[in-house]
Amino acid sequence: MDQSTATPDNAAQSANRGARRTLAATGVNHALHDGYTDLIYVLLPIWQSEFGLGYGMLALMRALYAGAMAGLQIPAGRLAERIDGKVILIFGTVLAALGYGLAGLSGSGAGLCLALVLSGAGSSTQHPLASAAVARAYGASARQPLGIYNFTGDLGKASIPALLSMLLIFMPWRYALMVLAFAGLAVAIYMALSMPPAGKARHAHAGGTRVKAGAYSRGFMLLFAIGVLDTAVRMGLLTFLPFLLQAKGASLPTTGLALSLVFIGGAAGKFTCGWLGERLGVLRTVLLTEGGTAFGILAVLALPLAPAMMVLPLLGVMLNGTSSVLYGTVPELSRKDQSERAFALFYTGTIGSGAVAPILYGILGDGFGPVAATVATAITAIAICPIAFALARHLRQLPVGAELQ
């Protein structure tokens, strides 16, 4: 009798340990890859000086990395239907590390471009497969762990470029990149040793029937639209914020501090809003964050410099908080065995929006001025609210435990 009652408890404890190991491994991996993504901002001025590159070439380098990362996420999700996601994650991490290692050995702009394409291709595996692994490990309780996973990316964005800057004090940039490449290989080894198998994205079903792509339901597409617009608001505002603050009399150091306040608030928002979404629900949380974003943007426009600076951390919380709620909802609107495809499409859309939105808002700014363009970002945030109401109807239709089917 004791053994029969202990067995389920032991199985549950083992599953919990496995889920925690999955979250820890994917979190470390997320920090590494997001840090790799932002390393290029530190490196571009160095490469411009050493190789005599023009601004067009520098922009091309950034575009090649971002394009490889965004464009290969959906293929990575499909590959996970045939190969364990853990294996693909490890391979992607090794490839991203080797890309930066190759950059450290490059002697020309063409070599750097090739290295960045390789690194971007490696990083393309991380978002969809790691998110799906966390969602699968935690099942119905995945929303808060996905918020934590989302938060770890901000830790990487803050720490790894800063680490590179410190390394550059003591060694040439080529050696510094080698150090970071070896760090990436160490993360890959850590994942191989500690992360449980993630499983394949698609499992066999009775009669060999393949399941239709439920990830592309109407509810998912509404969630996708919210993600695209939310990213557009964030990237559009960040494009104009330095100029708005300078118009209020902010110096260059003050502008840098202001952006840091937004980013710190954003990291806190990613961490807390996943938890908040579990308690308030998706609709209320999205209405809170998007309404707060619109109010915060208008407050920054209307207030003098000092009060506007005080608003920025809270604006950062609202600006980034929605994303954790959205990522946590992806598994609820897709079949468990198709999470990789759903996350791949979702991340591709948000990354693409982050690339296109500043251009569109920039055209608006050229025509009507930065204030009008910034007001347009607030209007976009408000426009998300009716889409959230439409999404809520689809969430209410989900049966209990639907994400586990």
Task: Mark where each language-model region is.
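C-terminal membrane-cytosol helix-exit motif in multi-pass small-molecule transporters
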Residues: 181-204, 387-392
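Extracytoplasmic gate region of multi-pass secondary transporters
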Residues: 40-41, 218-270
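Conserved MFS/SLC helix-loop-helix module at the cytosolic interface between two early adjacent transmembrane helices
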Residues: 71-109
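Interfacial helix-cap and linker-helix signal at transmembrane-aqueous boundaries
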Residues: 47-48, 79-80, 166-171, 245-246, ...
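Structural signature of the two symmetry-related core transmembrane helices
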Residues: 87-101, 284-299
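A late C-terminal transmembrane helix in Major Facilitator Superfamily
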Residues: 331-333, 337-370
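Residue-level signature of mid-helix packing/kink "hotspots" within the transmembrane helices
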Residues: 38, 66-74, 158, 263-271, ...
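Cytoplasmic helix-loop-helix junction between adjacent transmembrane helices
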Residues: 115-153
